[in-house]
Amino acid sequence: MNEYRSSLVFATPDVPLRDDVRRLGALVGDLLAEQVSADFLEEIERIRTTAIARRESDTPPAGLLSLLEGREPRAAEALVRAFSTYFQVVNIAERVHRIRRRRDYQRSGTDTPQPEGLHDALRRLKAQGVTLDELSEWLPRIDVEPVFTAHPTEAVRRALLEKEQLMVASLVDNLDGMRTPNERATDAARFRMALTASWQTADSSPVRPTVEDEREHVGFYLTQVLYRVIPVMYETLEHAIEETYGSTLALPRLLRFGTWVGGDMDGNPNVDAHTIAGTLDAQRRAVLDRYLNELWQLASLLSQSTTLVAVSPALSAQLERYQALLPDAAARSRPRHGDMPYRLLNDLMRARLQATLDDADGAYAAPAELEHDLQLILDSLEVNKGLHAGWFAVRRLLWRVRSFGFHLARLDVRQESSVHARAVADALGQADWDSQDATHRAGLLGPYASGEQALPQVDDEGNARLDAVFAALADARTRHGADALGSYIISMAHNRADVLTVLALARRGGLVDDAGAVPLDIVPLFETVDDLRGGTGTVQDLLADPVYRQHLRARGDTQMVMLGYSDSGKDGGIAASRWGLQRAQVELLEAAAELGVRLTFFHGRGGSIVRGGGKTTRALDAAPRGSVDGRLRVTEQGEVIHRKYGIRALALRSLEQMTGAVLLSSLRPRAPEPREDAWRPVMDLVAERSTVAYRGFVGAPDFMQYFRLATPIDVIERMTLGSRPSRRLGQDAALSNLRAIPWVFAWSQARAVIPGWYGVGSGLQAAVEAGHEDSLREMAQDWPFFRTFLDDIAMVLSKGDLNIAELFSRLAGPLHARFFPRIRDELALTKHWVKTLLGQRSLLQHDPRLALSIRLRNPYIDPISVLQVDLLQRWRATDGEDEELLRALVACVNGVAQGVQNTG
């Protein structure tokens, strides 16, 4: 049996997945025959078998090209959508299989819990000597915060996501072994209905989504998925603690959520003070509506009568206070529920919540007041035989209120440093501001940042826009409370002057508390290789600045620093990016500790490996010792949100994995590795030589022209994926101005995935030539950072295809001969050293499940990619004016994105 066929063997636990894939694949065939024709299905089968044969022989895709080229746009679009539909059902089957495997573990009753879950984490901690008292001391320090962003990487529209949820629900229902044949037939019919409706729904919206659309999109996951699973996460942790330690603990809040949607102004002119205010208002309405609905449902449970059961004196006293506070509501409720104190209090709590929603008299001043009421009910139920008469449901609502407050998710605001600099330069009348020394600028800013002097008001658009933003934040703090606001992030932060600038602008905008301090956490984002290298110096300067240090004392002597995975990779290649991020964390921690400041890292990770994606558990295991310390703040972008939080069971699993990983990394961090001192210079060399190779490639003359011809970047720029443009407004098409997301997306579509591996082979080869091969092998075996790095490169390489990348490259004409041989040679070098150092004959040999997932899809991705090359050539011949060809190309982009399971 050849390598390709043997790679498609399913392990015993995955046989149900194989059966689902076959069954759903047959269902797709039935769909195509019904919706198009039997001849169309036969053609799809012919193309599919040709693609598989091509994979088995590892030959150029000439046979595929001859089958696919020259098709009419609508016929091409139908073909692409047929293969995309297969990816859709395979992706769904795999997600449902994860739920199946989770249930298998839970049912097994063995002493081996599911890896990376909370039970697994606690058992490992106990085995390492962590006591219940130590766990109790640490839990209040745990703070896990996924932050949802609206980066344009979600290539599947909302209408299709909702239908996917219906398909998932029907498959999950079918997991029930007690289903009757009729019920299983109904499940299949529900799946077929949603699948057919998906086929009849256009893959992409004809208009670019607005900020409001993006807000609704993220709000869907927060209110429809995470809202429901948050209490279950805490219940799972309670059960795991009791099972592991034989005792229970009162759990503090461990999780909260953040969002950039409506607050990320960086390069997006559609985000401003109005979207900030509108987002906070919309989120408040959304979460209060959920509380109102849940209280309404609780009323049916809390029907206890005073003639049969008592209530606590504290609850009775609160009831009296509320009847005086809300006499009209009490008068309406008392005749019906006068003998039902819980229900009467519930009615009055709903009246207070409605007043909160309407900004009326009697409103709750803060979520803590609602929490207090719910706790009163819990305490009363507990002492009056009500543990099994509503206590459980009330506590679930309490966990939700603790997690979501009255704001749903904390809103971050982000803007680029140059925007602030231009505003201050105009305010101070200094046209040469950017050319002045950063230390000199910081000195000039000191009096304005401290409030000693007022930064002059200037009547221009840039200053007015920023003033409005800070005024909106001040108003939001009053209206929604401090918990509704996250951080103010400065992208492309280079020095302390960039941070002091924001402090001065915030004061001018009126964001000042009663004590005269600026109540804002200002976060520099280091996102280029050079800024990561210089980040320690910047933070040292910042923490030594008396004005900023005074500000920081008012913020609890805690400083957050955001690390950018995307632009650092685009700037210097993935090896320099990963190593720069690792070193920056170590050096920043040391610098902050010396100055008595607690540092928190905010990880700006994207969906793809290139942009810091991958499993959080492995990332934390590979992180520097002490860098977690109980806190994890990380962005969740684009297709990652759907993949991790689109299904309730998988959302719960994601939250458990993050929380468990933080507990492990914090309570029992990895022991120091003495050999790391010897390994760091080796990694320095790998990163340095990798950067030389990478920059030599992307910085070569005519490279950007080659990039624009050898990838479908021009199609991606025409797609309506998000509210933010693909490059910063008013700037040319240079690589430095192109955003990291479309940069990665374009190369992923071209199947070369250059940003995910280029230069790595050269870096490793240089280290070997310098006599470090034995060290590299030790690093791959014993250093989690390096092992994770190599594993990630292996995964990226597995998703690429050199033969198809060559088809794209030939679209560049004469430039193909200049650039593609370099790609081919560097790829061969990288594959060689990755496999050699990992001790593997083939990529992903250590992860057969992932290898199977990729190989299952590749024969179906290949026809779309080959067709994309043909369509791209024809579309460009029309100067990009043929809308039918463009629509077919957009379908190709969506299809490949579904197949490789990431975009940017």
Curated annotation (Swiss-Prot):
Cellular component terms per the entry's GO annotation: cytosol
Single annotated GO MF: phosphoenolpyruvate carboxylase activity
Residues of the active site: 151, 570
Domain of life according to the entry: Bacteria
Keyword Zinc listed: no
GO biological process: carbon fixation; oxaloacetate metabolic process; tricarboxylic acid cycle
Enzyme Commission number(s) from the entry: 4.1.1.31
Reaction(s) the record says it catalyses: oxaloacetate + phosphate = phosphoenolpyruvate + hydrogencarbonate
Reported cofactor(s): Mg(2+)
Pfam families associated with the record: PEPcase
Keywords: Carbon dioxide fixation, Lyase, Magnesium
Family: Belongs to the PEPCase type 1 family.
Stated role: Forms oxaloacetate, a four-carbon dicarboxylic acid source for the tricarboxylic acid cycle.
Entries under NCBIfam families matching the protein: PRK00009.1
HAMAP family associated with the record: PEPcase_type1 (MF_00595)
Protein name: Phosphoenolpyruvate carboxylase
Natural source organism: Xanthomonas campestris pv. campestris (strain ATCC 33913 / DSM 3586 / NCPPB 528 / LMG 568 / P 25)
